[in-house]
Each structure stands twice: as structure tokens, then as C-alpha cells.
Amino acid sequence: MLTKYHYIYHGNKIQIDMKEKKNERRAFLGKMALGLSSVVALPFLFSSKTKDEDNMEEVHPVKKIKALGFQWETADPFLFCVHHEDKYPKGNDAMGPDASLEGRSLGQDFIIKDGWRMYHGGTVPGFPGHPHRGFETITVVREGIVDHADSTGASGRYGNGDVQWMTAGKGVQHSEMFPLVSKEKENPMELFQIWLNLPKKSKMVEPHFAMLWNDTIPVIEEKDLDGKLSATIEIIAGTLKEENAPAPPPDSWANEKVNHVGIFNIKLEANSTFELEASVEGVNRTIYYYEGNDLKIQDLDIPFYHAAEVDPTKNLVIKNGDTVSKILVLQGMPIAEPVVQHGPFVMNTREEIQQAFEDYHATQYGGWPWEKYDMVHAREKKRFAKHADGMVELKEG
């Protein structure tokens, strides 16, 4: 999934237009509540105390607070995260919006209008076939449906709590379309797409994807002293509170436990308190506050739609205000290698990026075996995954 590069479709080939698209929403959000700065200056970082007094006082575990834009900044080993939330209307016969598309920049529709966007889609919202190399995409669908197709011949439909974890490796084309399967009611969509880097040793592995179906993802429900629900924690990657997420793909940086990669989605009930347990020294840990109106980490106010970089070695007490709040936690040991990204490719050197483009234009990373780039499956199709080796997974609903 990409947000700032143009794709021009010519038969069974795609031309990548590297002209960047100005993201007005990101520019706006980047200034929201912060004036001209995107980083909150924490008061305790500018103390007038003496050196001896400073040595006696514990440093606050929140290192930095940053505003969130359309693409959320992340720390190594992650590359970035995008939070898509669209209130799609009823679907039409083609599983596109049963609404006028007039006034939209079809093919590059990233401005919210009437509560939703078409993205790169022309008929159905989503992201028609496009290439990747050198990293992984982790697509966490909170609500709605995603149809997958790729250049290996694999395909799938997933949603409503499912997660697709795709290793692009040496190169793959894939499409991610958002079919509006209901003609009788609205089709709301919410998902995160997280880009996780691959180390140099794994950048040219065979493409692969794994499905983490919603019934395999551990969910912890915590209650307060009165027995009332206080927090719901989904463990998408890694380990938290002695619960382990499903295994990631075999070549993932997350597959080695010593890398402590974690992806945790946490819902906090009104007026609740939650303790996020410590990880280990060296891990990069960031908390993304994406829903709610009042949140404190160790008694420090965190503005809505901001991220807090925190000390991974500290247990953190998170206090919620009088409405439901939601946070996403990303953590992991850094890969600590050079990162060179150009469009859909992430490698270690400029020469490798150039080679990625040359290989793509020569091979199309296996070509596109589907009848169209904005491939969607039949409306009545249930959730499924068909892998490149022919294995099929079928799910109800």
C-alpha cells in the first residue's frame, strides 16, 4: 500500500511516476496544537536545577511527544504506519460506493470527502496492483474487508480483526482493494498498515504472506477491583503479559524473539488505569494515541493524535479520561543498518534501489496473472487465503 506515488497502468505493466503528491491532511495535522513545531518540548527537559539535584531526580520515561500526520513516523525496525478510517456508504453492483464520485481526483483521492476516500481506486476504493521489495507489510483490519491478489498467484479476503503479514522480499506485486460488499447498509473501514523493515540478509528472500485470523490473535481483558472491564489488549506481534501472538513469517525480523518486536492494540475504558509492562534495554518503543480525549502516561498529558516515544525499561502507568481511548504500541530492537527508500522499495544502498527498479521493469516481479489490477472477489465470497503453493484457508463470515 502506498500513499504518495503515482501508478500508471499499461496493459500488464505498471509505470511508476515518482512525482510526490502533497499531503494536505498531513501538513495540517503536523501543525495541530503545536504551532510551527511537531515536537512537544517536555518541561522536565529544561530544568534550572543544579547538576547534583538532577542526578537525584529520576528522568521521566516519556522521551518525546510528536504529532501524527497521515503517515505516522516510526522508529527502527519499523518504517512507518498508516491509519485508514473511512465511512464508506452502501455498495453498488460493482462493490464500489453507491454515491457520486464527482469532484474526486480518481486515482489519487486522498482527501476525505463525505467521510471517505477512493485512494488509488477508480471503481472500488483501495490500492490496485503495485510492487514492493525489501521489507514487510502488516495490515491490521479493525473493520471492513480487504481483497488481496498478487504476482505469485496468491489471493485472499480478510477483515474484521484479521491481520495479513506479507514479506515482499526480493519482489512482489500485490493489490489491496476495499470492496463494499453490503448493498443494504454502510461499509465502514478501519485499518492500520505497518511497514516493518527487513535486515540485509533477508531483503532478497522469496515473497511470502501469512494470515493471522482474528480467532488466533490473543485478546486479554483486564478488570478493575470492582470487576468492571478496564482494558482490552490485542497481541498482534510479540509477547505481553505472558501471552504470545501467532508466529510471523519465517524471514521476518519479528521471527527472532531476541528482537522483541511487539504490536499491541489497546482499548482503555473510561476512567481506567492500565500498566504497560517493561520490555528490555535497547528496544525502541512508541505509543500512538489515536482515539480519545484525555490520556496520561506517568501523569504526563499526551495530546490526542500524538505519539510518545518511551523508555522501554520502565513499567508505564497509563491513565485514561472519561471516554474510551485507543492506543497502538510498536516496539522492537533496531536493525541498525542503512535505510534507503525510494517509492515502493526499501534497501540498504542507492545501487540496490536502482537494481530494484531495473529488475521490476525487466520482470514485473513475476507479472500480473489477474484479469485486472483492481482485482476484487465475488460479493458472496467468504474470508479465505489461497497461497502460492496452493494451500487454501477458508473462514466463516
Predicted regions and their residues:
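Glycine- and acidic-residue-biased ligand/ion/polar-headgroup-sensing regions
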Residues: 133-149, 153, 162, 169-170, ...
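Ligand-binding loop in jelly-roll beta-barrel domains
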Residues: 169-201, 312-341
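N-terminal secretory signal peptides
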Residues: 1-27
